[in-house]
Amino acid sequence: MKQYLDLEKYVLENGTQKGDRTGTGTISTFGYQMRFDLQEGFPIMTTKRVPFKLVVSELLWFLHGDTNIRYLLQHNNNIWNEWAFERFVKSADYKGEDMTDFGLRAERDPAFKEVYQAEMEQFKTRILEDEGFANKYGELGNIYGKQWREWKTSQGETIDQLADVIEMIKTNPNSRRLIVSAWNPEDIPNMALPPCHSLFQFYVADGKLSCQLYQRSADIFLGVPFNIASYALLTHLIAREVGLDVGEFIHTMGDAHLYNNHIEQVKEQLSRTPHALPKLVLSDKPTTIFDFDVADISLDGYHPDPAIKAPISV
């Protein structure tokens, strides 16, 4: 997608070198927006393969209000493992090798990488096979799904923001309050990772549903391709339920950054030519967005270039 490649190029050419929480370092810009017309095809990278089923299972995990990686692992989705693992290795229950700064050390030290990978595999197996262990160490805190579906009020009640917004789209589509927020300051200290994609808003006009996302922190090479596909999919699912066509997905970013250890991968991607976008295919079986299974969602005509691997910064 040209919009995304333009973002990569802009940050490479105009970004500022900055330090960051992970110690990796970034090239960063502040305030950038991309627009995608969802009528023109499903916006997923074609200049590198994005594992769409992982996008689907993560979004369904959010929609279920789940915050435990066990569901993700049951669907062969490993994208949240590092944050749960980090909590475990910092606990008194962990008795293995020192895992301080495991992400950076695994990237730089092949011997340590083998130890880390073995510890991670043991951790994943325990999450899948030991429900008690999963309940304790598979939890990531009150992250996205919990805030979307069970925002806690000062009176001890809960608000299902997503269900409320869907109902409002049906009954009052001209509302300017079609907003869901994952940014709950009270819960931030207890989250494994504070929400990067923090708030989204819907807009109805001319029989079409559009969505704008505000993302406070945007990992351009690894995270943003998932975010684009995820929120485009969410827009399609809700539009289907409320009887609207899809309009635009607008992606607004705060700190949009390229990690220093992703620069060569970005240059490789920029050397590639985008292909035609695929079409989203949804099963007729589910009646609401909360009824979908992974098998109900697929892409037709997705023929991307090969994946480009890059390390994740934790």
From Swiss-Prot:
EC number(s) from the headed UniProt entry? 2.1.1.45
What keywords are assigned to this protein? Cytoplasm, Methyltransferase, Nucleotide biosynthesis, Transferase
Catalytic residue list = C196 (nucleophile)
Cytoplasm is among the record's keywords: yes
Keyword Cytoplasm present in the record's keywords: the answer is yes
Matching PROSITE patterns, A to Z? THYMIDYLATE_SYNTHASE
- What does the UniProt entry say about where the protein is found? Cytoplasm
Q: Which Pfam families match?
A: Thymidylat_synt
List residues binding dUMP.
Answer: R21, R176, R177, R216, S217, A218, D219, N227, H257, L258, Y259
Chemical reaction(s) catalysed: dUMP + (6R)-5,10-methylene-5,6,7,8-tetrahydrofolate = 7,8-dihydrofolate + dTMP
Coiled-coil ranges (or none): none
Superkingdom of origin:
Bacteria
A Gene Ontology molecular function term of the record: thymidylate synthase activity
| CDD domains (UniProt xref) | TS_Pyrimidine_HMase
Q: In which pathway does it act?
A: Pyrimidine metabolism; dTTP biosynthesis
On assembly, the entry states:
Homodimer.
**Record NCBIfam families:** PRK01827.1-2, thym_sym
* Name recorded for this polypeptide: Thymidylate synthase
Q: List the source organism.
A: Listeria welshimeri serovar 6b (strain ATCC 35897 / DSM 20650 / CCUG 15529 / CIP 8149 / NCTC 11857 / SLCC 5334 / V8)
